[in-house]
């Protein structure tokens, strides 16, 4: 089972998109709110500004942990996220469309 955490102020809006995505992949998963005590396989982290990236320094992770960022269309933030070795950057107002676009890529990462 894949352990997934969503860190977002918009949890209620994003959660169904993530659930639908993993249900479509037919992968057994457990999606929870982020807590400092757990290590997850995948983190979805929503950011709004550069300071929000500090959360990445506090994530408990393994070498195989995937980190997906959900954020604004801001090329400086995208660049910083890539330097921080995150695995994908989703534009927040295009999230559903980007899940479809990256379906095969994410499936291979998992």
Question: Residues of each region from the PLM?
Answer:
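Short, charged N-terminal beta->alpha structural module
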Residues: 1-30
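Conserved phosphotransfer microenvironments
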Residues: 15, 35-66, 71-77
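Charge-rich, solvent-exposed alpha-helical interaction surfaces
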Residues: 17-21, 58, 80, 98
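Residue-level detector of alpha-helical secondary structure
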Residues: 19-22, 26, 79, 103, ...
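Helix C-cap/helix->beta junction micro-motif
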Residues: 25, 62-63, 84
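Alpha4 helix (beta4-alpha4-beta5 surface) of REC/receiver domains from two-component response regulators
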Residues: 73-88
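Receiver (REC) domain switch/output surface
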Residues: 85, 96-110
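A Lys-centered signature of the CheY-like receiver
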Residues: 91-92
């Amino acid at each position: 089972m894949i352990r997934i955490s969503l860190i977002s102020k918009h949890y209620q809006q994003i959660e169904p998109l993530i659930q639908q995505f993993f249900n479509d992949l037919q992968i057994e998963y457990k999606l929870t709110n982020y807590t400092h005590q757990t290590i997850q396989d995948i983190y979805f982290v929503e950011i709004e500004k550069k300071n929000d990236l500090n959360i990445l320094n506090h994530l408990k992770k393994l070498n195989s942990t995937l980190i997906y960022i959900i954020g604004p269309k801001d090329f400086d933030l995208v660049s910083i996220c890539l330097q921080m070795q995150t695995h994908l950057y989703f534009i927040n107002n295009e999230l559903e469309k980007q899940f479809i676009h990256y379906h095969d890529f994410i499936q291979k990462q998992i």
